[in-house]
Amino acid sequence: MARLLRPEVAIVTKVGLEHYSAFRGKEAVAQEKGELVSALQPAGLAILNADDPHVMAMAKRTAARIVTFGRSDTADYRLDSAEASFPRLLKVTVSCSEGSFELQTAFVGEEFWIATLAAFATAVELGVAPDLAISRIASFAVPWNRCGILATNGGPTFIVDTVKAPNDSIPAAIAILSKSQPANKRAVIGFISDYTGGPRKGAALAYDLAYQCADQFIFVGENGHRARPSEEDRKNGKFIDFLLPKEASDYVRATSRPDELILLKGSQTQHLERIALSWTHDVQCWETNCGKYIDCLQCGMVEVPYNEHRKARKARARALRDKGMSRSG
């Protein structure tokens, strides 16, 4: 694909195990991501994470200009600080040849400094004035289901991170909860993917991390037992698991506090976002295997029972068609 598109700019933020199920290791992931850098023409630009040796090794695969960012003292765009503690949003301080700058973002977690710094470096290297880049970064709206905030009226506040849940992303998600200011916190974790070894590792990692910062850990799906909670944690309610998102949603609503923060972390096919949406919408679709790789708001049928979706879509298409005909007439 990179050879076909022939990019002029390549940005590589990091190499992790997010794609472990497909590539089985960081070396293979790095090889695949490096194809983007290899496809650059000599006049192109590669923006690389100076802290990741797998990323920096890609510099050897191109004759294009290399610009680096990261914590390293040798980085062209050096991270001086990254601070986030919800409700205080991420603020990044960066030093470069243009000077020192503060970047205020709408992100809730410190992990997003990587994307923020990469975006700033790319913009400035392409000729955008630093002040304009800072302004655009500050106004960037975070996608609502990628660690977006959904505040409810008189209910809890949700951090919605329900696009994907590779095992490699679990620590950063729970770190957001750990560093947040609200006194009452819960973690709702669903299906975890791309783990090395068996599924117990993913569930156990999530539970071990959340145990240290959350008042309660709620697991949704078939693998809750693999977290191996103690009998005491089950009895006192520190750990609870549900098979279905609807069951978890009903429980959260019945036990919620208006001042609490709840992290929702799961894969896109599980649609845990419905737990938060049930506070702002009349959620009627609780299908567990709809097969859609879009979120429930994109689908547009969250307030329609799943067995009525086809009928509702036909009615909606008919209404749009009739509306178009009336305009043309």
Residue positions per predicted region:
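Acidic, Mg2+-coordinating active-site environments of NTP-dependent enzymes
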Residues: 2, 6-157, 182-183, 207-211, ...
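ATP-dependent carboxylate-amine ligase
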Residues: 63, 121-329
